[in-house]
Amino acid sequence: MPLLFLERFPWPSLQTYTALSALLLAGTVLSAYSTVRDSEFSSALSEGPQNEELKLENLGNVATGVLLHLITDSLFVWVMVNTACCILMLIGKVIQCIVFGPLRVSEKQHLKDKFWNFIFYKFIFIFGVLNVQRVEEVVLWCLWFSMLIFLHLMVQLCKDRFEYLSFSPTTPMSSHVRVLALLVSVLSCCGGLAVLCALAGHIHGMHTVAFMAAECLLVTVRTGHVIIRYSIHLWDLNHEGTWENKSSYIYYTDFIMELAILSLDLMHHIHMLLFGNIWLSMASLVIFMQLRHLFHEVQRRIRRHKNYLRVIDNMESRFAVATPEELAANNDDCAICWDSMTTARKLPCGHLFHNSCLRSWLEQDTSCPTCRMSLNIHEGRREREEGQREPLEDNMAAAGAADARAHINQHNHFFHFDGSRIASWLPSFSVEVMHTTNILGIAQANNSQLNGMAHQIQEMFPQVPYHLILQDLQLTRSVEVTTDNILEGRIQVPFPTQSTDRTPIQMNAASEDGAGASSGSEVAAPEAEDFEVRGSRFSKSADERQRMLMQRKEELLLRARRRYLHKKPEDGDAYSVLGADNDDSVPSIEDEDSDSVTLRRRRLAAAAERRILRQEPSPF
């Protein structure tokens, strides 16, 4: 939190800071000169007149006295420290203009984060670990850490710029030369700081030398790391053809250097913890948290290296090197890096990839990059759990069995808190919230694969709706199992709608038998007709949707005609009320058991008619 406050504080610009520092230094020098001159003037009056040589000697003594006064005074010495910091900032600005030019947003953010973390942590080190009481020692440590932070920022800036330039093959060589020359200069400055550490060992003791040497070694190793990476990149640029072993050199360079930096930092913090009696202080908590973070980083790096070795072993044992005939027959570029292939490895699906590209891919996924076919690289449960926690490093876990239970389809929400962005001693932790959409724990295949299998089954069973086949495939993920379910009746197929003729139904209204025969033929007609399966309501095909709409329209017209014809009276005394239900069956009104409600209504209507006729008077 204090770092956030410092970052949001309205700091002055470099021009304003330089002007204020110059004014402050001038005022301090004038004040010190007036003090020294008064003392020298009083001594000169007591000694009498002097010649020119003595006057020049007195001027030299005055300059020396002013400098000593600035260094020894408890207030003026901080002005000198501020002046040194201002000079370093101006040197850094000049280096930026000559070597880097305008900085990118990410580079500025990295510099800001590293600067404030370094300031906060070294403040804890000076006043919490060393427990410095004298002003002179505080000044010396401030000057020492000012030089260190300057070198750290230069190395960080060179690293960010190298990562940016390495992605562009058209970068001019002059840009690389400038950055590499700056790295060599930083490395030589680290050698000079090592000499200062050796000189300080005779005065301040071995513990102080160990602290200074650890900080100096950290800068040296980081600088050497960037120089080696830069050398590999420049060699690859000037090397003709594809350098297959480049990724291996880069990986082992990163692994050795990062492990060396973490080990040095870990021993440095252990030394700080054991140096002072700080077991019950705030500084001890800070160091303990930093030790925990470094220890977990070492574990994570070693675990990642084991995963790398496991990937190499699986790749070399399972996937053979492609022969020249296969490369000539394929005649294609690598699908990962889009570069031509002189050597490649062949997957079981037949696709070819560079050795380094395939290794990088298998560290993240265990399927073919082109067709997404599972490679079935089986590992233990422990590796699977590690792969869920670190998907970019340890996800070479099992792809699952080929039957039906490979993975669980989950929607994950990953939240990560990086404490090092706020302060280097803050911990980093991650929270992953998962919910499973498949209760049975069966993975859902790719949509394209499911659609292909569903169309294949529908060609064999056209009477089964497409959506029912797709629902069963989402559970079984197997064409054979879904086919068995259809044959054994486990999939409930709805009764299909028959295709109807557009010609109106001709009914014989003269005789009751003719009507019965026509209705009977209508009921029996669907048995002789071919069935047409109605597609899904939300079909993707426009033709299928249009056909479904016309079919539904014809059904509604047919039912309306039937209702109209069956409600029309056929004889003078009797009415035939025929209803069309969902099965298109025509019930007979002569059967009393068919519809008791209709018969009761007819009887009531006949009785009411007779009553009305009796009440009417006779005309004669």
Swiss-Prot record:
Coiled coil: none
Top-rank taxon: Eukaryota
Enzyme class: transferase
Pfam families recorded: CUE, G2BR, zf-RING_2
KO phenotype (gene knockout): Knockdown embryos are small and display dysregulation of lipid homeostasis. They show increased lipid content, and increased cholesterol synthesis. They demonstrate impaired touch-evoked escape responses associated with decreased axonal branching.
Acidic residues: compositionally biased ranges: 581-595
SMART domains, sorted: CUE, RING
GO molecular function: ubiquitin binding; ubiquitin protein ligase activity; zinc ion binding
Zinc finger regions, RING-type: 334-372
InterPro entries, alphabetized: AMFR_Ube2g2-bd, CUE, Znf_RING, Znf_RING/FYVE/PHD
Protein name: E3 ubiquitin-protein ligase AMFR
Species in which this protein is naturally found: Danio rerio (Zebrafish)
Gene (UniProt): amfra
